[in-house]
Design a protein with these regions (language model features):
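Catalytic, metal-anchored helix/loop core of enzyme active sites in primary metabolism
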Residues: 1-197
């Protein structure tokens, strides 16, 4: 991955997204941020959240209940339908989105994430486990690092390196106020920019 170019990183096989989110997908930071979201949205502990790589991008999310049964949100790799459902919940609105056909996807595969190669996912779990201001630091550093990559200031693998170093250099605040979050975000961005120089 040391020689991954911007053009290569921006070519996602299944999704049509903006540049920043596409790079987050390529580094697996998108999954890391989704893990942090899941923790807060569903009041989960880190050990209750699993990440599974699904190359076909058909199953967007799944929940396993206490009895072992599961529910999954499945569909074509397009966020229009999940967003429509989220906005209309609990109602279902008719839509003329393309329909999913199981015969077009005769097999769905799943893999464990490679956190050695894609360390941003591990950094996100670390930030979530540390708690306090660390998820804010992670996000701020990632935004600056991805912007630097997109502007040819750093290489692909440096994205993770500068995020990790920013997290190491930034003091954690256990229970930050909103004003403190704003300041922590500003400081983390400044630290990341300094590391990139």
């Amino acid at each position: 991955l040391a020689d991954v170019t911007k053009a290569q990183a921006l070519k996602h096989p299944n999704w049509d997204m903006g540049a920043k989110i596409t790079i987050d997908s390529a580094t697996m930071m998108n999954k890391g941020l989704e893990v942090i979201e899941a923790k807060w949205l569903f009041n989960l502990k880190p050990e209750q959240i699993d990440v599974i790589v699904h190359p076909q991008s058909i199953i967007h999310s799944a929940v396993q209940f206490e009895d072992g049964s599961m529910k999954a949100q499945m569909g074509l790799p397009d966020m229009k339908l999940p967003i429509q459902y989220a906005l209309a919940y609990p109602n279902r609105l008719s839509a003329n989105f393309p329909r999913f056909n199981f015969m077009d996807y005769p097999s769905l595969t799943f893999e464990a994430p490679d956190t050695e190669t894609f360390g941003n996912l591990a950094l996100a779990f670390k930030a979530m486990e540390e708690g306090g201001s660390m998820p804010c630091v992670l996000n701020a550093a990632n935004e600056v690092a991805v912007d630097a990559f997109l502007n040819d200031k750093i290489k692909f693998l440096q994205i993770q390196a500068v995020i990790e170093e920013t997290m190491q250099k930034t003091k954690k605040v256990e229970h930050p106020s909103v004003d403190e979050y704003i300041e922590i975000d500003r400081e983390a961005r400044a630290t990341t920019r300094e590391l990139i120089k």
